[in-house]
Amino acid sequence: DVLGGINHPVAQEWAWARPFDIRHVTPALYVDPAPETENRNMVWMKTFTPLADDPALHRAALTYASDYTLLEPILRQHGVAWIQPGMSVASLDHAMWFHRPARVDQWLLYVQDSPSAQGARGLGTGAVFTEDGTLVATVAQEGMIRLPEGAAARRARVRGAAQRMALRTVLR
C-alpha cells in the first residue's frame, strides 16, 4: 500500500516481490517513526495468490509471514523507522503456536505487542486472527535493535533526515 507508489528498487522489491500483501492498520514505519512511542502494531496480511489446500503449506507460509513485521512494536518503542541509518536489526529467536487451521490466502489480522524493549533488545509477541475474530496462532520473537552512538549517531541523523525528505517527496 505505502511502498507500491515509491519509484525505488528497494520499495518495489518490498511491495511486489514478496509473496504477501501486507496492509498496516497502525501507521507503517518504513520512512517515519510512529508519532507516539507505543508498543502495538497491527497489519492485515494474505498471500497475493491462492495456495493449495495443504494445511502444512498454510502453516509454513504463516510462519514465514509472521517474521515480516514482528519487530515493529519494538521499533515503535525505540521511536525509530526501518529507514534509520546505521541501525542494525536481527531476529534472535522465533516461536509459534498454532491453535487452529487457517488459510493464509485469506485476510488475517496480525496484532503485535512489545511487553519489553530496552538495551538494544526487545520482545515481540503476536496473535493472528481470521476475519471473523478467531485466534489461529500466537507468536513470540526476541529481536536486537542497535542504534549508532556518538558521532556515528549524529551522522546517521543527518543522513536519515535527508533520506526521509527525499522519500516524502516521492510519496506526494
Please tell me what each predicted stretch does:
Residues 1-172:
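Terminal targeting signals and extreme-terminal segments of soluble enzymes
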